[in-house]
Amino acid sequence: MGTVTTSDGTNIFYKDWGPRDGLPVVFHHGWPLSADDWDNQMLFFLSHGYRVIAHDRRGHGRSDQPSTGHDMDTYAADVAALTEALDLRGAVHIGHSTGGGEVARYVARAEPGRVAKAVLVSAVPPVMVKSDTNPDGLPLEVFDEFRAALAANRAQFYIDVPSGPFYGFNREGATVSQGLIDHWWLQGMMGAANAHYECIAAFSETDFTDDLKRIDVPVLVAHGTDDQVVPYADAAPKSAELLANATLKSYEGLPHGMLSTHPEVLNPDLLAFVKS
């Protein structure tokens, strides 16, 4: 564990486990979580001999809580600072949800040789919010409701999200894990309310179309068809179509947080893609 200081003085917390000569796999978490959300996958890849790295986005987890920089350009710049500090080359970057947007923006701008492959898991690209150019997106009012709920009672909102749509625990017959709900809440409450509030616009309104078009490394696009947070039809197949070298993997009936609810399904596919 350590920190890297960005150009604006923000300290970014990160974990760095495994052999320094191992192939680096970098994990990017979703909103409003932390690097801890990838614990299962980090241990899995560590057991296969990889070097595994994950950071807490600014304003999230154990990183600093600055008043500025809660946008995709800055998130990507923070990742660049981390990869440069650790001198990561030929890395695989895996992003979930908001972290998938961060991966898209970073990889599209990365120095040659820094990135070998990327994975977008239940990721927000190409763009979430509805507009004239994205008529199938979610109405802005959905994200206004997110902001209102966060501002009114963040602690309760951070119980409601994982108890319901995030993990699909609101579906009939779902096996509810109180541990996952509590873990989600704890990660969320570690971060800064202002950062989480502003990040809602970052993950919902940022258009990653041009980023996806610029990426030329192989990309696995993995998404559950019962994603109630980032609807499958307006995300994964559209991203795969924009990417030059994409593999689309659909998971029938799996939720947004499938990396935690179904790691035994997702992890082997991630490993196979990294090794391919």
UniProtKB/Swiss-Prot annotation:
Q: Where is the AB hydrolase-1 domain?
A: 24-254
Q: Could you tell me the keywords of this UniProt record?
A: Chloride, Oxidoreductase, Peroxidase
**What would you give as a GO molecular function for this chain, any one?**
chloride peroxidase activity
Entry EC no(s): 1.11.1.-
The catalytic residues are: S97, D227, H256
Alphabetical list of InterPro entries matching this protein: AB_hydrolase, AB_hydrolase_1, AB_hydrolase_fold, Epox_hydrolase-like
Q: Which residues form the signal peptide?
A: none
Broad enzyme group: oxidoreductase
- A Pfam family it matches: Abhydrolase_1
Q: Which PANTHER family match?
A: HYDROLASE, ALPHA/BETA FOLD FAMILY PROTEIN, NON-HEME CHLOROPEROXIDASE
Q: Which family does it belong to?
A: Belongs to the AB hydrolase superfamily. Bacterial non-heme haloperoxidase / perhydrolase family.
Its assembly, as annotated, is: Homodimer.
The protein here is known as Non-heme chloroperoxidase
